[in-house]
Amino acid sequence: MIARLHLFLCLLAVLGLTACAEPKWASQEAVDAARYVEGPPTYITLYTVVNKSTGSGAHSAILVNASERVIFDPAGTWYHPKLPERNDVHFGMNDKALAFYIDYHTRKTYDTIEQKIYVSPEVAELVLRRVENYGAVGKAMCTNATSSVLTGVPGFESLRHTFSPKKLSREFGKLPGVTTR
């Protein structure tokens, strides 16, 4: 009984530490200056980082192309000094910044899967508002946050809440019209 209580308390402590987020809040001036508008068509791209040796999912993030293009990199470690960040949302995601983001995650030991789906401007704006309002995400909670943002969005109703990057990628890949590379 004491061993189970000890195990429970240790697990609770670990979960408590992973819930600690590091909020960042760039100034409105910095966000406005960095704003990047790709233009239509509007789309959502899911990025899943996969360990090459184990095949396990290591990270999830979403690129949102709406009235502006941003990346929601929950609990991520990626950083660019010229791109302002607000609670895991990086602004100014032009093609060069996006290539840098993908290159940062894709290494000798990791692959990055890119899954894109075209959506209506209204759906893209809804996802943009959801990522902007989500808040800072604690370590190891990236897919939890990503799936929470997408769950219930029109066209994404089949997605379930999950902590597994590979499971989210599999479900996302089943959506009609998704292209994967």
Regions from the PLM with identified roles:
Residues T48-N51, A58-H59, T109-I117, L128-V137, ...:
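Second-shell loop/turn segments in exported
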Residues G16-A19:
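C-terminal motif of bacterial Sec signal peptides marking the signal peptidase cleavage site
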Residues A21-Q28, E125-R181:
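Activation targets extended, charge/polar-rich intrinsically disordered C-terminal tails
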